[in-house]
UniProtKB/Swiss-Prot annotation:
The lineage of its organism: Bacteria, Pseudomonadati, Pseudomonadota, Gammaproteobacteria, Chromatiales. The keyword Transmembrane helix does not apply. Its EC number is 1.5.1.5, 3.5.4.9. Keywords: Amino-acid biosynthesis, Histidine biosynthesis, Hydrolase, Methionine biosynthesis, Multifunctional enzyme, NADP, One-carbon metabolism, Oxidoreductase, Purine biosynthesis. This is Bifunctional protein FolD. It catalyses: (6R)-5,10-methylene-5,6,7,8-tetrahydrofolate + NADP(+) = (6R)-5,10-methenyltetrahydrofolate + NADPH; (6R)-5,10-methenyltetrahydrofolate + H2O = (6R)-10-formyltetrahydrofolate + H(+).
Amino acid sequence: MSAQILDGKAIAAELREQVRKQVEARVERGGRRPGLAVVLVGADPASTVYVGKKRQACEQLGMHSSAHELPAETTQDELLALVDELNGRDEIDGILVQLPLPDHIDEQTVIDRIHPDKDVDGFHPVNMGRLTLRLPGLRPCTPNGVMTMLAHAGIELEGKDAVIIGQSNIVGRPMAMELLNARCTITICHSRTRNLADRVRAADIVVAAVGRPGFVPGDWIKPGAVVIDVGINRLESGKLTGDVDFAAARELAGWITPVPGGVGPMTVATLMANTLAAAEARDSRA
């Protein structure tokens, strides 16, 4: 048995095209192009690549983007002042501060400063709370993108046992809430979890988000399980790989995401969808 591939690249292309058409229709109605401000502090190579991809996506979909590249020595107060300015600018619908930030800046303080209506990453406590309470809001991009992928493939979630490996605020926790809202029974695993292999082997859905290459061996996967690999790890050879042993897991899983080409493209496409949604929501409140 060989798993079916959840082709995030193809599904993301469909989502991006939907967003592009909606932006085009919005402009034809006399509306303003959605605007995304992207803030980068320092010159971390991976962050620089991600920011470039997000800006490129904006341009391809007919959105306005503004880049704010700050030196690594930027103070927290200076960054907060920029966020305040962007919060007040009418042409900006979404604000994205690329993480991680330099050690001298507290990430949560910065996230909290972004207005919830412009928090297109979905990390603000207000938006996290709305997700938890099953209320409409801007949802974290990676978990939201995963849910879009699963829906596109027609994968039934209700009643399934889901294991999420990793408890980060960016992926693990909101992913658990997304799956809980879909009526899965969820287990969140972390560095103190006992009998991790047994828990994973019992799961119908496995989400790996720990940032360690090959952390999940193929023989941990239950036959027919859905495997979502959120990890993006660069080996010394330069090759990108996920948190799951893809070749071995593919022989047992029913569905599996590749790395690259799985979850990553969905994250960027969902960010674009969130930016459009933020613009539409702001218009409805005007």
